[in-house]
Regions:
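LRR N-terminal entry segment and analogous cap-like coil->beta motifs
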Residues: 77-172
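Hydrophobic anchor residues at the C-terminal helix/turn of individual leucine-rich repeat
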Residues: 132-133, 157, 178-181, 205, ...
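Conserved hydrophobic position(s) of the canonical leucine-rich repeat
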Residues: 139, 163, 187, 211, ...
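Aromatic- and Gly/Pro-enriched helix-to-coil junctions and flexible linker segments
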Residues: 1-97, 101, 113-115
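The leucine-rich repeat
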Residues: 26, 128, 149-153, 173-177, ...
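Leucine-rich solenoid repeat scaffolds
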Residues: 202-242
Length: 242
């Protein structure tokens, strides 16, 4: 009835695609397949025609993704990391401790305990670093702008396994200081505005393939350097002031 991965040689696909006037048209009676249903059959055969397979096992093209969502309410888009993490709510004692250590915070939503955390002190304290490490799984957005960060501080930040956004602007950090961040496999946004990073930063950024956006204005990185390196970052937006 079908040839795996070859719709054009599959009898079932041929017959549902025939004109209704053709004596071999399927189904011979009842409602014919819609255009969208024919598309799905074609895609299913191309993917190997596995009866027992789930959608997660198939390569869903953007066209099929849109069709499944609009026609059947099936959302096959990959969920962002923050929606995949499953944690119990942060205990009140932790919230109090973080606030006493000069952090302001909010959860991403009522049902998502991951934290958007901002340090409001002049210099990141040892107490703050200890608390960040203690509650590392909860921290996904972190703003450490203008708080006199050191190389050692960045080694602690590299332990925040669920970090997706990191703001390091207005700190005297250099390119090599960022090397530990290659452990942050879910980091999507990195703000390096007004830091001391130079054009060597692109080698560091290559080691963080999850990045989608990097802010580089008011650094030692030139526009020419950004344009030269942009082909190496097809999925990353490199932002620099003109």
């Amino acid at each position: 009835a079908f040839v795996s991965k070859n719709p054009s040689k599959s009898l079932i696909f041929k017959r549902i695609s025939f004109s209704q006037n053709n004596e071999k048209f399927m189904p011979p009676t009842g409602t014919p397949f819609s255009y969208h249903e024919i598309q799905l059959v074609q895609w299913w055969i191309q993917e190997g025609a596995n009866y027992a397979g789930s959608l997660n096992e198939f390569s869903v093209t953007p066209e099929i993704q849109t069709l499944l969502l609009k026609q059947y309410g099936l959302d096959t888009r990959e969920k962002p990391w923050v929606e995949k993490v499953n944690l119990d709510p942060l205990p009140p004692s932790a919230v109090i401790a973080l606030e006493k250590a000069n952090f302001s915070m909010r959860t991403l939503s009522q049902n998502n305990p991951l934290l958007d955390l901002r340090y409001q002190g002049e210099k990141l304290s040892k107490q703050a670093l200890t608390l960040m490490e203690t509650y590392a799984p909860y921290i996904t957005w972190l703003n450490l702008s203008n708080c006199k960060l050191t190389n050692s501080d960045l080694k602690t930040i590299a332990k925040l396994e669920n970090l997706t956004r990191l703001n390091l602007q207005q700190n005297s950090i250099r390119t090599n200081d960022l090397a530990p961040l290659n452990t942050l496999s879910h980091l999507e946004v990195l703000n390096l505005h007004s830091t001391l990073v130079n054009q060597d930063v692109f080698e560091i950024l290559k080691s963080i393939p999850s990045l989608k956006k990097v802010f580089l204005w008011n650094t030692k990185v030139s526009l020419n350097a950004v344009l030269k390196n942009k082909p190496a970052f097809p999925s990353t937006e490199l932002i620099i002031a003109l």
